[in-house]
Every structure is written in C-alpha cells, then in structure tokens.
Amino acid sequence: MTEPEATDAFEPKKVLAQLPHLPGVYRYYDTHGAVLYVGKARDLKKRVSSYFTKTLLSPRIAMMVTRIARIETTVTRSEAEALLLENNLIKALAPRYNILFRDDKSYPYLKLTGHKFPRMAYYRGAVDRKNQYFGPFPSAWAVRESIQILQRVFQLRTCEDSVFNNRTRPCLLHQIGRCTAPCVAAINEEDYARDVANASRFLLGRQGEVMKELEQKMHAFASELKFEQAAAVRNQMSSLSTVLHQQAIEVGSDSDVDILAVVALGGRVCVNLAMVRGGRHLGDKAYFPAHVESALTADEGGLQEDDAALASVALASNSLAGDDVIDDETAALADTADALAIAQEMPSEDEENEQNDAAEEVDVAEEAGSEPAKPRKGRAATGGIEAEVLEAFIAQHYLGNRVPPVLVVSHAPANRELVDVLIEQAGHKVTVLRQPQGQRRAWLTMAEQNARLALARLLSEQGSQQARTRALTDTLGMECDDLAHLRIECFDISHTMGEATQASCVVYHHHKMQSSEYRRYNITGITPGDDYAAMRQVLTRRYEKMVEQAAANAADEAAELQSDAAADPSLTPDAAEPVAAGGILPTIVLIDGGKGQVEIARQVFTELGLDTGMLVGVAKGEGRKVGLETLIFADGRAPLELGKESAALMLVAQIRDEAHRFAITGMRAKRGKTRQTSRLEELEGVGAKRRQRLLARFGGLRGVVAASVEDLASVEGISQALAEQIYRQLH
C-alpha cells in the first residue's frame, strides 16, 4: 500500500516514482479526504502515470486531476482480484466520479424451510444453508405469484411454525384445496416430501420432469386400483398444465436468463433488468445509477461547459511540478467538475496492453446467428455511456451474487476479466449475448422499451418535483440559489388515546424524500395525549445537539480563520451550510398542526436561538383533503391559504402525509409490541430467551395463557415448578 501524506503540496512525481509495475487498485482523494475515483490497473505505475501525462489528457480529465491531493494504491495478485477489490471499494466509498448503483441487498426470494414439513415463504435478507432459496426475483409480486402457483399445484403449507405446531383442525386453505394440511397429519411425510421435491424442480424450470413423474404416479395408483389417489394426481397434473398454458411468455427451453437493457436520456441513464427463470418471465426492475452525470458528455445529455476555460484549467494544473498554484478564478471553474464528463475519457492503460486486450474476446457462445460481444477499444465502439454503465452494473450486481447461465445485453461489456470472474464465481459457463435471436430478442426489445418508459417517467417526475420546490420557495418568499440543497424537515405526533406516543421526522431534499434520513422518537415523561408536550420534546431533542455542535464548529472555524488571516490577510471566510453532528440544519421546518403546535415550536426555536422564520405549520383541512390546508407562520406573517391546484401546496401535502404515514406505522408497531408482550414481561422467572421460546411455541400471548402446566413445562428451559408458577401468574 502506497499512502502519501497530504499535509504538504501534492507532488505527483514523488508518488509515481514509488508505484510498482504490478496489478492493483488506485484511489484518488481531494484535499478534504473525500474519494474522487477508484480504478483498477494491470500495471499500477503505467495506469496512474497516464493521468499526469499532458499529451493524453482531455480538459475534462484534467479538471478531476486538479482536485487530486492524495493517491493510495493496493497491490493485488491478479487483475481479476483487482476487479473484485475495485467493485467492493466503489460500493463502500461511493466515489463522486465512479458510476454507482445502489447496493440492493433486499432482493426477494422464495424460501422452502428445512422443517420436517417444509414451509413455503416470501423472504428478504441473507441466505443460509439450512433452507432452500429460489431467486432472486425482481419484485415481491413475482415471489407471491410463484407462491400462489405452488399452492394451486403442490399445496405446500405457508403458515408459521408456531401456528403449524398448534393446529387442531385444518385451516381454510385446506378446505379450498390450497394446502394438504400436514399440521393435522392429513398427508404423510413421504408424500409431502415428494410434493416439495416437485415444487423445487418446478422452480428450477424442470417442469417436464415433474409432469412425467406425476403421470407415472397416476398410472401406478390406477393399476393398484387406488382411484381416489389417482384422481388427486390427475387434478394436480391438470393444475400444472393450466399454469404452464397460462404463461404469457415462453422460451421453449428450461434455461435461466437475465436481460439487461441500458438507455440514456436527458442526462440520466436507466438499466432495466428482466429475469426469466425456467422459461417464465418474472418481470423487470429499473435501476438509476448515481454520479452518472459526471460520465455524460454534452451530446449525451450532460451539462455543457466552456471548453476553452477548461483547457486553461488543464494547462494550469496538469504539471508534474508540485508548487503550481491555481488562482481564484481557475479554482471557481474547477468547481464545475461535478457535472463534467469524466468516466468515458479516463485514460486507458498503455498502448501495448490495449492492443493485447483488443485481441481478446469476451466469453460468449453463438446461437443461431447471434454475434458475440466484443471488447472495446475506445468508447465509441461500445455505444457510449450505455456500455460504461452496463459494465458497472454487471460488476456491482453480480459479483458476490448468483449469476444465471445466460446474460442478454443491449451493449457489449468491455472487460474480459469481468466475465472471467463471473464464470469462476458461478462455477458454470456464463454466456453473454449481444444480438440474440427469437424469443430472447423479443425480451431484449421489451426490456429496452421498459427502460425508456421508466426513464421518461423519472424525468417527468423530477421536472414536476423541481417545479413544486420552486413554487414553494416563491410562495414563502425565500431566496434559494440551488433548489437541490433546499432541505425540509417535517414533524408529526401519533398515538392512540395517549398510548405508545411517537414523533416522526421525515426529510426532503434534492427534490425527493430521503427515507434513509427519517427518524422516529419515542416520547416519554409527558401526560398521555399531550401533543404540545410531545412536540416540544421532539423538537428539543432533534435540534438542541445540532445547534450546540454547529456553534462549536463555528468557533473552531473562526479560530482557524483568525490564525490563517494573521498569516495571510487576503483570506476571506467561505460561506457554508451549518453542519452539525446530527446533520445539516434544515431550510424549512414543517409542523403538522395548527396555531398551538406552531407556538410550541416557536418557543423551542427561540430558546435554541434558531430562526423562527423557517417554521411553517400545516393546519389540516376537512378530512385531510389537499387544498383545504392553511399555512401558519411562527414569525407573525398572516396565515396563507393556497388553492388545491397550487404546486407549492402539493409539495407541502406530500411531505406532511409522508410524516403522518411514518409516524402511524411506528406507533402501531410499538403499540402492538407493547400489547403482545407486556404481560409476559411481567412474569417472574421469565427472561428474554424464555419469553421468546414461549412465543415461538404457542404463537402469542393468547396461546401461552391457554396452555396447560404440562404444555408450559414442555418448552425448553422451563421446569415443572416454573411452569406451575407461570400458570398461576397468568390465571
């Protein structure tokens, strides 16, 4: 690892002299320690040096290079290993000049548990070896549809183990022919296991095997004169035939296929992933990568810039001498690099390596006229930004996850090592098809169309949200140079007759709700049902520490500026948003309530020294109907009523309703948990583990209360004496 210090002026010559001629990963950092870019190299010295060679750099790349203050490298044993490390670092560090997809770990699966009578269930989360998992599926709908099909054909159970263990008679699903009721021994273990095996084969796309086995089983029952069993198998075959006939999209084979289509439009890019499992099209999902605007040229929809000015920046800053200084005007131009095209013009590795790469072919198999995907030499050969995005998606989506045998792509992946790593990881051949034929071509066309529709819908929604944000600032008389940085926080209080009081805080910025920044606050120490006290508590807890930290930060910055000013009187302070330990102070604070709640908020903000002008109350209209709300201001301005057609009010109502939804769901969960476990928590001699075992065994508080002493004593960790004590306390 090479890790030069950034305390002195950055001198590329010293750093480059230390780099080895080995494969590895390099990382560029700016003066604040933020990661600018992560890349891999077959030869670190040649690759990194190419960024500091004037003759090869475009003005856009030079813009990024001007920001480099530190370089770190990690040597790996091979380029394939470097690819894996690069992918992990991009996900972990989210560099501003790398194309980044959200790391979606929440793909849904269909799970068959390792129970004696396996349960079929919808599942999200990490997989293990105790159970069987089928998927991932592109959507929850696809999983639930598959469960419904399996219920119709194989009648596997879907109930929780706690319910299964305590059934005394079949449930409604058995009565309507959706479950064989193993809970009451209506089917033996051997027959149920056969149904589970057939369901597994069906999910793996081996429907032909299932039909053949069922047919043999039906004839065997008939030859043994077991006509009822034969009729049951016949009905199962009929259900399966109906399901197979109803599949709207068929492939004619049992292979698994993923279809990847990329479309760029209006400065944004969409990747549409469609999944086919066992010949069944399970639907698709659209992905929108972050930081892609830094990889778009003006022709592709990126922001345009003054190339002459950028060229001057490049010439001023691209010297290997470490003592070059950029003037204020040039530095200001450098700030526009956020919107510049970087990724497509990153310098390639040395010409010799590039020529060697051009001689290689991506591992693809031809099928009836299909053309193999070729590696690129330069961006033009790959279809522009789409190929760059597709390569990033394949790396971030499939490395570490299941890879199907066939990938149908709209643009050729550029990196042979990427495909080789996928093959090694999957343990089977991975075929990449650029120009498929037949049904696969129809799937690709459909995926491309869905990508265009999703992208058009996103751009339309973004335009609408931006218009609403602008309308709100105009309505409130606010001046905001960058609407994307307008930060709105909204608070709501929720409880049931004073029980389980919770406050919610939702956050809106960059023209959309930011669910990762939502927070819930449990309200304690107040009179039940006192909304005013609850509002005071949540606002104080939310902003008190932020204000203290902001003040401390301001004091530190002032002291540092004073010290710098003594050394250089020409320095002036830079305007910045007040950042605190808990985040950035909002521009607008919405209070879901009328004059009383707004007055409480005004008092809290006055005590904390915050501007009351940012406080806006949203008084509900009749029945919470949009268009009847009144905006109430804490700084004394007259209340404002906006018509239901107002774009500003649409945004306020959207944020207010989201705060209400978030508060209600949290309150209900808290209330349900309290009601379910409160009596068990009061039992003497029953701790968390025993309480959990009781709930798992009896399915809830009602089941524990109904259990006999003998039933209680049968639970692991509960003796006969403790069972009698629990029984007495509950009765």
Curated annotation (Swiss-Prot):
Any GO BP annotation: SOS response
Segments for region (Disordered): 346-381
Domain GIY-YIG: 21-99
Acidic residues bias: start-end ranges: 347-369
Pfam families: GIY-YIG, HHH_5, UVR, UvrC_RNaseH, UvrC_RNaseH_dom
GO CC field: cytoplasm; excinuclease repair complex
Positions of the UVR domain: 208-243
Principal location listed in the UniProt entry: cytoplasm
SUPFAM superfamilies: C-terminal UvrC-binding domain of UvrB, GIY-YIG endonuclease, RuvA domain 2-like
PROSITE patterns xref list: GIY_YIG, UVR, UVRC
Subcellular location: Cytoplasm
Any one GO MF annotation of this record: excinuclease ABC activity
Task performed by this protein: The UvrABC repair system catalyzes the recognition and processing of DNA lesions. UvrC both incises the 5' and 3' sides of the lesion. The N-terminal half is responsible for the 3' incision and the C-terminal half is responsible for the 5' incision.
Protein's UniProt name: UvrABC system protein C
Source organism of the structure: Paraburkholderia phytofirmans (strain DSM 17436 / LMG 22146 / PsJN)
